Amino acid sequence: DVYKRQEVKFHHNPDSTHGFCGAALSSNVIHWWKNDAGKWQWEKIIDIDNEPHPDWPIPIPGVMSAILVSMDDKYLYLNNWLHGDMRQYDISDPHNPKLTGQIWMGGLLGKAPVVNGVDMAGGPQMFQLSLDGKRLYVTTSLFSTWDNQFYPEIRDKGGVMVMIDCDPENGGMSINPDFIVNFGNEPNGPSRCHEARYPGGDCTSDIWL
């Protein structure tokens, strides 16, 4: 467990001591906080099971390469780059997260090879959430050498960016059917896409006071 710790995210509320870390290869989420006695505590709160695959000698790990916390500190989002799914958890109680949404796009499990008419190469990788918590943009390229190893077809197809509609009130996710950016069609492409940013601020770069 807790192997290849990748991204660290804190609550946006500066008075909160709660934070989260995603472990990529073991596909866990760790939660930490300071207790009433002022001592730091930690616990594992999410586990993603490995999945069998006929072409692999071992079950495929999810490879949770990124996590993100919504601006209101209500939801945690995570990806499973090799499995091909994005997940939304309600972390109103950070000790007991609840799965409230899941979508599939690409991945090695074959559950969503085509999204909005585009052949997917890769799986959900980096992602960014709008400040209002309603739009999650997800890209598919992790690192070119690893892309080529696990998704060799990405050399010819390029990457894509998908928009996921999120319900910040009740939870839930769905792929927006009217939005997709196919970087395989870029001039001098095929190109790949990694990280998205909002010019007016996003849930990674902002806090609230």
Locations of regions flagged by a protein language model:
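Short, small-residue-biased leader/transition segments that mark boundaries at the very start
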Residues: 2-3
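Loop/turn-rich, solvent-exposed surfaces of beta-rich toroidal or solenoidal domains
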Residues: 16-32, 57-153
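Conserved GH/AH loop at the N-terminal boundary of individual WD40 repeats
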Residues: 48-49, 106
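Sequence/structural signature of beta-propeller modules
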Residues: 167, 174-209
